[in-house]
């Protein structure tokens, strides 16, 4: 499962659309998204309620505590909303130690209310955890002792009996409506492959549940079966994260393939770089370098998996090598081409793409005094390793090659010793 956060606008859009389909509950929520490209005149023409109702506006940027941070404006008309957005759009704010400009807002009707409820659903390994409280809102953390929680195993349906402990202390007249709402939201959660969903708070308007603030995460590995249900969904980067041009290139490449291609620059001046096969292995290599005390020298995080073809690996490796060899300073550098023992990825084929990239970047590798350490196993690995050994001799670039007889992370220590040596 790959949990990906989505904007509040999309969370509410999905809930409104599919709660009616799955549970017959017609949420009366309205919302509009505002970005740099928004024309307010056109927006109001498309959504006339914006000019007839009092409004709420807030950033929709995947960070919480917006109310406590003074980033939520209440009871405005559309002209005031426009001014609020104008003053803050593109302005950098700091949240949770991360700084980034605000680029996206959500605008909704202002809903006066007295009661605030809390609801969250979290996907766990063996089922789902559902939490509910009658004391929702910005003080939910201070009132966490009042939150009721149940665990629903994967094979169990959300029945009235299962839901009963959550709503047991509600007034009798409210239990049916809120219980049906919780069951309906859970149906949407499962049907659309949400991995996390939170409403803090939701309230009751004209006798019906009404989400005021909402967060959602989807399991993006389920996109293949949900693309029609999700519609034009966006998976924004985490707040404060901006892709470099090289990272953006790999991100676009990853979007176009059934394989997985990931690349993040951690320290452009780092002297230890990785190009690792497998999601688990890639983390192990990075952690090992850190555990040995050299996290500050780690240049990147990189992972390829899911049997990418030779051309995809070639494009991927070019980017990694360009970053790893940039701005040579006379000191040694190391590249870890590692991985575990593949089950189905043709090691010979993926290494062919890497070898082509290494040939192209020969002069850069030498200028950067790059030492390469290879460890891999799996289908056709002997062919791949033999090609790597031959390449080292041809290029005159130091390449040490190991198969599954060597420990997976042994090359990390060798790389560190190499770059830290005086010569």
Curated annotation (Swiss-Prot):
<dbReference type="InterPro" id="IPR056749">
    <property type="entry name" value="Citrate_synth_N"/>
</dbReference>
<dbReference type="GO" id="GO:0003878">
    <property type="term" value="F:ATP citrate synthase activity"/>
</dbReference>
<dbReference type="Pfam" id="PF24948">
    <property type="entry name" value="Citrate_synth_N"/>
</dbReference>
<dbReference type="GO" id="GO:0005524">
    <property type="term" value="F:ATP binding"/>
</dbReference>
<dbReference type="GO" id="GO:0005829">
    <property type="term" value="C:cytosol"/>
</dbReference>
<keyword id="KW-0067">ATP-binding</keyword>
<keyword id="KW-0012">Acyltransferase</keyword>
<keyword id="KW-0963">Cytoplasm</keyword>
<comment type="subunit">
    <text>Heterooctamer of 4 alpha and 4 beta chains.</text>
</comment>
<dbReference type="Pfam" id="PF16114">
    <property type="entry name" value="Citrate_bind"/>
</dbReference>
<feature type="binding site">
    <location>
        <position position="345"/>
    </location>
    <ligand>
        <name>citrate</name>
    </ligand>
</feature>
<dbReference type="InterPro" id="IPR032263">
    <property type="entry name" value="Citrate-bd"/>
</dbReference>
<comment type="function">
    <text>ATP citrate-lyase is the primary enzyme responsible for the synthesis of cytosolic acetyl-CoA, used for the elongation of fatty acids and biosynthesis of isoprenoids, flavonoids and malonated derivatives. May supply substrate to the cytosolic acetyl-CoA carboxylase, which generates the malonyl-CoA used for the synthesis of a multitude of compounds, including very long chain fatty acids and flavonoids. In contrast to all known animal ACL enzymes having a homomeric structure, plant ACLs are composed of alpha and beta chains.</text>
</comment>
<dbReference type="InterPro" id="IPR016102">
    <property type="entry name" value="Succinyl-CoA_synth-like"/>
</dbReference>
<keyword id="KW-0808">Transferase</keyword>
<dbReference type="GO" id="GO:0006629">
    <property type="term" value="P:lipid metabolic process"/>
</dbReference>
<feature type="binding site">
    <location>
        <position position="343"/>
    </location>
    <ligand>
        <name>citrate</name>
    </ligand>
</feature>
<protein>
    <recommendedName>
        <fullName>ATP-citrate synthase alpha chain protein 2</fullName>
        <ecNumber>2.3.3.8</ecNumber>
    </recommendedName>
</protein>
<feature type="binding site">
    <location>
        <position position="376"/>
    </location>
    <ligand>
        <name>citrate</name>
    </ligand>
</feature>
<keyword id="KW-0443">Lipid metabolism</keyword>
<comment type="similarity">
    <text>Belongs to the succinate/malate CoA ligase beta subunit family.</text>
</comment>
<keyword id="KW-0547">Nucleotide-binding</keyword>
<keyword id="KW-0444">Lipid biosynthesis</keyword>
């Amino acid at each position: 499962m790959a949990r990906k956060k989505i904007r509040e606008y999309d969370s509410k859009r999905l809930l409104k659309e599919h709660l009616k389909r799955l549970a017959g509950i017609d949420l009366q929520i309205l919302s509009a998204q505002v970005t740099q490209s928004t024309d307010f005149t056109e927006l109001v023409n498309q959504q006339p309620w914006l000019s007839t109702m009092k409004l709420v506006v807030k950033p929709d940027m995947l960070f919480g505590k917006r109310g406590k941070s003074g980033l939520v404006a209440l009871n405005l008309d559309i002209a005031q909303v426009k001014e609020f957005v104008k003053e803050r759009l593109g302005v950098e704010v700091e949240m949770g130690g991360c700084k980034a400009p605000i680029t996206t807002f959500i605008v909704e009707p202002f809903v006066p209310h007295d009661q605030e409820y809390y609801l969250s659903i979290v996907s766990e390994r063996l089922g789902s955890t559902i939490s509910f409280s009658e004391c929702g809102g910005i003080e939910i953390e201070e009132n966490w002792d009042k939150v009721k929680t149940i665990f629903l195993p994967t094979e169990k349906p959300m029945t009235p009996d299962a839901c009963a402990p959550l709503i047991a202390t509600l007034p009798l007249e409210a239990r049916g409506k809120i219980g049906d709402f919780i069951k309906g939201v859970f149906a949407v959660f499962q049907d659309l492959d949400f991995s996390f969903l939170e409403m803090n708070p939701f309230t009751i308007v004209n006798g019906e549940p009404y989400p005021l603030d909402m967060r959602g995460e989807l399991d993006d590995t389920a996109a293949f079966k949900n693309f029609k249900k999700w519609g034009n969904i966006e998976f924004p980067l985490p707040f404060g994260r901006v892709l470099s041009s090289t990272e953006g290139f790999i991100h676009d490449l990853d979007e176009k393939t059934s394989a997985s291609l990931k690349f993040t620059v951690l320290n452009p001046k780092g002297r230890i770089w990785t190009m690792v096969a497998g999601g688990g292995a890639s983390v192990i290599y990075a952690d090992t370098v850190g555990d040995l005390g050299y996290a500050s020298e780690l240049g990147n995080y990189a992972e390829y998996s899911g049997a990418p073809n030779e051309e995809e690996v070639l494009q991927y490796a070019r980017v990694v090598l360009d970053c790893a060899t940039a701005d040579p300073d006379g000191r040694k550098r190391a590249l870890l081409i590692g991985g575990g023992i593949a089950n189905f990825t043709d090691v010979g084929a993926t290494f062919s793409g890497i070898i082509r990239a290494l040939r192209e970047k020969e002069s850069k590798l030498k200028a950067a005094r790059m030492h390469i350490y290879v460890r891999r196993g799996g289908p056709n690995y002997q062919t791949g390793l033999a090609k790597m050994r031959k390449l080292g001799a041809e290029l005159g670039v130091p390449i040490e090659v190991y198969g599954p007889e060597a420990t997976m992370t042994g090359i990390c220590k060798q790389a560190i010793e190499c770059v830290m040596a005086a010569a």
